From Swiss-Prot:
Transmembrane segments: none annotated. Residues 1-18 have a biased composition (Low complexity). This is Striatin-interacting proteins 2. Residues 39-52 have a biased composition (Basic and acidic residues). Plays a role in the regulation of cell morphology and cytoskeletal organization. Required in the control of cell shape. Calmodulin-binding scaffolding protein which is the center of the striatin-interacting phosphatase and kinase (STRIPAK) complexes. STRIPAK complexes have critical roles in protein (de)phosphorylation and are regulators of multiple signaling pathways including Hippo, MAPK, nuclear receptor and cytoskeleton remodeling. Residues 379-389 have a biased composition (Acidic residues). Its main location: cytoplasm. The modification Phosphoserine is found at S328, S339, S364. GO terms for cellular component: cytoplasm; cytosol; FAR/SIN/STRIPAK complex.
């Protein structure tokens, strides 16, 4: 299998936002001949500057949700290079409207019946052979979907009429007509071969596809949006549209699978002209519309737990996070207080050696982590810097993700809330959870200690154990949490053991199930393609000749000639990449969450292919930049955003017009993308010790700690979760040097009562036999997919009658006159015909 996320050679990652890396990575390996003390002093200056800058970062008032505001989601469909086409669409509509409607009324003045008649005429005129005429009619439809902005006075009016027109277009069958046109354009070999011959693909090569995808996206996004004032007819149309997109109709695949096939075709190089940003945005919104967003997912989870007889959920995680407050990273002096009191590095190194000799009991991974690269609280010496550089070079050659400097500035640790905040909220935010496995493990250890033998999975017999153990078991059982996945795994084990007695499983035809069935056999290719595009869109990626070109639908035919035009194009390119990252991160997270709810092994199948395609190091590569700069980047030009650009005259291009407008303290889509990627990384590594070891091997701790500078509660929570799962592997010295981060983990992350996360004594922290864990999981996934989806046409368990007496005793319906000529029939049809017994057995 190809490794799509294999990055380029190690080096300082360039930030497409123009912000640089921001963490001192520009030093390289230079200055090796300088004394250690001046270099260390310069390092501390850099650390102070970075830490002081992060303290000034205000708390970001960000509300996480399925997507951004309606206007923002519509505006991200268009690149600034496409703005001239708004006028073209309007002209095409007005020319057609004047020839077809004899009345002098405008579109908004027509009665609904007249509007429907005109739309029917538009759809009839789409049925022409001429591509040029077809494109003009499609542009007229696009103008309607865009809100007939030529007749509107405000942005609110444009958005209102865009929704109205999209519902009208859907009710007249426009989506189905455009779906047929999309199939034609995908199969258009002439456009593909023309794009392949060109040295540089531009926005002109995808005109037809962009028009079709824009109409479909506007329809999906406008119809998906629910409002209380929507009329009953719109609500009915919404449910019909959702069903139409979710289920395969007329023996065709669900719409999402068509878009997935476009993504793989684009990544294979067969269709470089595909407007991939529009494809990904439409794919994300179709999946969200058909499967449901996060609120719908929570409702499905509650419903499924009730069906399985499980107790209700203690809390809604997203609602709990919304009530949490972000913590400030500690100041430089607090963070390095212990280091400033420490002895000189040379003496410290000597004392380390003597201390190791005195210790008789070590963490399970102390030997594994003898050369700890996370001791950033102490001044780094030249020898330690070279050791850090050697440690980075040990990474897999195809995964040179941590393009770090040998001197990694100490990331500011998380600190507990100040004394005036401790009272709010009272107690810890999460209810503790205990797994059945945890209770069994606790009782096994207790029985071994007190009575000398174990009772397997028996958690009820407490004979011979002291009273405190009884109380502990009672407390553990009070907080026992049984997940839907536990029930599904147990059912799967029973189906594997007793396939005949339990019979065939009844699988409900939910949208998630239908989508998984359609994706199953091409799922590895889909995941690889998405990660390839994500790698190309990451701000830390460098331009390489072998990387895919994701800018085909943003680059103009003629490159800019002035500085201002170049600035505008640079902003457009960065914005284009940010939107791609946003759509892929949200799409992958939605797929994982819905598949996990539908069946745990569907989730594990997608997860394994993401891991095999190097998703974990790719996300770490993404975060190996100045995340604060990425989140606060202003790659947008407000006056050029839809619908503003359709109402106001486009201003003359000046430096002021490029910088005017958006004064928000952060970029919503970039913060949304970062949280999605952290949640994705958390889902891939949770309870998977082999994957957690990947976080350790790729030196993720300093990368993740740098992200704590962003004062946003949800982002900090998922960073702390990822740090928590690997603390047991990082060694005692790392935990000692990062006590403020450990305190933040204790304060904000859910507790497992007997989880030994803060120490290395857990049996799961042993650094061996991780491959067996992944192999066992893969075998279970293959058994699940084979049992449920690889059903032979003739069941292996169908009854076969081999008894001669019963076969001869069967009564056959024969014609009344058959006995008159049965001897002739025997001669012709039996005795004179050669019998192929193999074929006969197969047919019967």
């Amino acid at each position: 299998m190809d490794d799509p996320a294999a990055p380029g050679p190690a080096g300082s990652p360039a930030n497409d936002n123009g912000n640089g890396n921001g963490n001192g990575n520009g030093n390289g390996n230079g200055g090796k001949g300088k004394p250690a003390v001046p270099k260390g002093r310069e390092t501390f200056r850099n650390q102070r500057r970075e830490s002081e800058g992060s303290v000034d970062c205000p708390t970001l008032e960000f509300e996480y949700g399925d997507s951004d505001g309606h206007a923002a989601e519509l505006s991200e469909l268009y690149s600034y290079t496409e703005n001239l086409e708004f006028t073209t669409n309007r002209k095409c509509f007005e020319e057609d409207f004047r020839t077809q409607v004899q009345d002098t009324k405008e579109w908004l003045e027509l009665e609904e019946d007249a509007q429907k008649t005109y739309v029917m005429g538009l759809l009839d005129r789409l049925e022409v052979v001429s591509r040029e005429k077809r494109l003009k009619v499609a542009r007229a439809v696009l103008y309607l979907a865009q809100g007939t902005f030529g007749e509107c006075d405000s942005e609110v009016d444009v958005l209102h009429w865009s929704r109205y027109n999209c519902f009208l277009l859907y009710q007249m069958g426009t989506f189905s007509a455009f779906l047929e046109l999309l199939h034609m354009e995908i199969d258009n070999s002439q456009a593909s071969s023309s794009a392949l011959r060109k040295p540089a693909v531009s926005i002109a090569d995808s005109t037809e596809l962009r028009v079709l995808l824009s109409v479909m996206y506007l329809m999906v996004e406008n119809i998906r949006l629910e409002r209380e004032i929507d009329p009953c007819g719109w609500r009915t149309a919404r449910e019909t549209f959702r069903t139409e997109l979710s289920f395969s109709t007329h023996n065709e695949e669900p719409f999402a699978l068509l878009l997935f096939s476009m993504v793989t075709k684009f990544c294979s190089g067969l269709a470089p002209h595909f407007p991939i940003k529009k494809v990904l945005l439409l794919l994300w919104k179709v999946v969200m519309f058909t499967l449901g967003g996060f609120e719908h997912l929570q409702a499905l989870k509650i419903q499924k737990r009730a069906e399985l007889g499980l107790p209700p959920l203690a809390e809604d995680s997203i609602q709990v996070v919304k009530s949490m407050r972000a913590a400030s990273p500690p100041s430089y002096t607090l963070d390095l207080g212990e280091s400033q009191l420490a002895p000189p590095p040379s003496k410290l190194r000597g004392r380390r050696g003597s201390r190791r000799q005195l210790l008789t009991k070590q963490d399970s991974l102390d030997i594994y982590n003898e050369r700890d690269l996370f001791k950033t609280e102490e001044p780094a010496t030249e020898e330690e810097e070279e050791s850090a550089a050697d440690g980075e070079r040990t990474l897999d050659g195809e995964l040179d993700l941590l393009e770090q400097d040998p001197l990694v500035p100490p990331p500011p640790s998380q600190t507990p809330l100040s004394t005036d905040r401790v009272a709010f909220p009272k107690g810890l935010p999460w209810a503790p959870k205990v797994r059945q496995k945890d209770i069994e493990h606790f009782l096994e250890m207790s029985r071994n200690k007190f009575i000398g033998f174990t009772l397997g999975q028996d958690t009820d017999t407490l004979v011979g154990l002291p009273r405190p153990i009884h109380e502990s078991v009672k407390t553990l059982k009070q907080h026992k949490y049984i997940s839907i996945a536990d029930i599904q795994i147990k059912n799967e084990e029973e189906l594997e053991k007793c396939p005949l007695s339990l019979g065939e499983e009844v699988v409900p035809e939910t949208p998630s199930e239908i989508l998984y069935q359609g994706m199953l056999y091409s799922l590895p290719q889909y995941m690889i393609a998405l990660l390839k595009i994500l790698l190309a869109a990451a701000p830390t990626s460098k331009a390489k000749t072998d990387s895919i070109n994701i800018l085909a639908d943003v680059l103009p035919e003629e490159m800019p000639v002035t500085v201002l035009q170049s600035m505008k194009l640079g902003i457009d390119v960065n914005r284009h990449k940010e939107i791609i990252v946003k759509s892929i991160s949200a799409l992958l997270l939605l797929l994982l969450k819905h598949f996990k709810l539908n069946h745990i092994y569907q989730f594990e199948y997608v997860s394994q292919h993401l891991v095999f395609a190097n998703c974990i190091p790719l996300i770490l590569k993404f975060f190996n930049q100045n995340i604060l700069s990425y989140i606060t980047a202003k790659n947008s030009i407000s006056v050029l955003d839809y619908p503003c650009c359709t109402i106001q005259d486009l201003p003359e291009l000046t430096t002021e017009s490029l910088e005017a407008g958006d004064n928000s303290q952060f970029c919503w889509r970039n913060l949304f993308s970062c949280i999605n990627l952290l949640r994705l990384l958390n889902k891939l590594t949770k309870w998977k010790h082999s994957r957690t070891m990947m976080l350790v091997v790729f030196k993720s701790a300093p990368i993740l700690k740098r992200a704590l500078k962003v004062k946003q509660a949800m982002l900090q929570l998922y960073v702390l979760k990822l740090l928590k799962i690997q603390t047991k592997y990082l060694g005692r010295q790392w935990r000692k040097s990062n006590m403020k981060t450990m305190s933040a983990i204790y304060q904000k992350v859910r507790h497992r009562m007997n989880d030994d996360w803060a120490y290395g004594n857990d049996i799961d922290a042993r650094p061996w036999d991780f491959q067996a864990e992944e192999c066992t999981l893969r075998a279970n996934i293959e058994a699940f997919n084979s049992r449920r989806y690889d059903k032979p046409q003739d069941s292996e368990f169908s009854p076969v009658d081999n008894c001669l007496q019963s076969v001869l005793g069967q009564r056959l319906d024969l014609p009344e006159d058959f006995h008159y000529s049965y001897e002739l029939w025997l001669e012709r049809e039996v005795f004179s015909q050669p019998i192929c017994w193999e074929e006969l057995l197969q047919n019967h």
